[in-house]
Amino acid sequence: FDEVGEPGEFFTRQDGTSGFGDIRLIGKYALWVSTKHLLVGGLGVKTPTGEFKLLDSEGAINEPTIMPGTGSWDAIVSAYYDYQVMPHQLDVFLSSSYQINTENDLNYKFGNTLLVNAGTSYLIAVKNPATISLQVNMRHAPRDEFNGEEVPSTGGKWVYLTPGVKVDVSSGTALYTHVQLPIYQFVNEENLVPRYGLIIGVSHAF
């Protein structure tokens, strides 16, 4: 990708990518646990399991920023704090993580990523537990680098408002969904930005 990130490039639907992404493995340890306080620290690694050499419609390696994976091993450090305003019913939390990225074998390095989240959740039912939540999510990343040079149209700052709901369906198992709505987006030069995000998942406590 000799002209990676150059503004003014033209893309078609055939230039999109899809596939299995990178896997993040994070170990967490509770540093402070009490009736109203919880502080957790975490260390982890992002493994290069996702494809990062997919070709575009012209047979060249596609834009790195839309690949399922990055092709690099990256370190992750995280922290989480929760305060129980009304124990087991109403809480507020603050969390942050920082991903330190390395260069892949195509000499491309994604900018280190800072994530900061703050929010609250409220238990609205006890017999069939359901929890509603509201979060503010912030993401910041500097420009990527290719062959040691900064890449145009990469990096930026994003802020999202994220309402969500979680429903316990059995002992230890819950279904959850979140809708991520952008309230501030700043990108360098030109770049793709999402109009919204939808997260649906299942969690289970062992």
Which residue stretches match the model-derived regions?
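Outer-membrane pore/translocation modules
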Residues: 1-111
